[in-house]
């Protein structure tokens, strides 16, 4: 149910973001502290502004009210994915090749669940490839809990 709902919302959001030259990055529908939140993450090549997030929110809200895909009361949040954005879609792994990433596994590999390195990209088998400590490593996507852009100070 949740995946179908998120896919429906993604379709609606994508129509709006495409119209403005933005990218629909992700949609999350979560319950936190007894409240429901619909979080929509958008971006563009040079970064998304607060005004652009507000624009999408104002256009999205009446469409969601009309189509009513969510039966519960919820809060709508539209924002950028942040500096440490999660990489989820194939295009993310292409766009951020060469960038440093933090990769976390569901289960330890050789006693380690966290890896940091340079993103090489996706293999033909759809595995994630990074260079960590000068060594090329490949991870099956189903074993990876999350990949985020690393923030370096």
Curated annotation (Swiss-Prot):
Query: Principal place where this protein is found?
Result: cytoplasm
- GO biological process terms on file: ribosomal small subunit assembly; translation
Q: Name one Pfam family in it.
A: DUF150_C
List where this protein forms a coiled coil.
none
**Would the keyword 4Fe-4S be found if you checked this record's keyword annotation?**
no
Cellular component annotations (GO), alphabetically ordered = cytosol
Q: Does the keyword Membrane apply?
A: no
Q: What is this protein called?
A: Ribosome maturation factor RimP
């Amino acid at each position: 149910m949740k995946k179908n709902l998120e896919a429906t919302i993604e379709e609606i959001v994508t129509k709006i973001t495409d119209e403005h030259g933005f990218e629909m990055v992700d949609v999350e529908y979560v319950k936190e502290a007894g409240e429901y939140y619909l979080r929509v993450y958008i971006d563009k090549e040079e970064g998304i502004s607060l005004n652009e997030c507000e624009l999408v929110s104002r256009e999205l809200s009446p469409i969601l009210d009309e189509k009513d895909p969510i039966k519960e009361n919820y809060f709508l949040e539209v924002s950028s994915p942040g500096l440490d954005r999660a990489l989820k879609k194939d295009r993310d792994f292409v766009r951020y090749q060469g960038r440093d990433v933090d990769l976390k596994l569901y289960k330890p590999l050789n006693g380690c669940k966290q890896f940091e390195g340079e993103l090489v990209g996706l293999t033909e088998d759809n595995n994630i490839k990074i260079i960590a400590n000068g060594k090329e490593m490949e991870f099956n996507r189903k074993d990876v809990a999350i990949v985020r852009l690393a923030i370096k100070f």
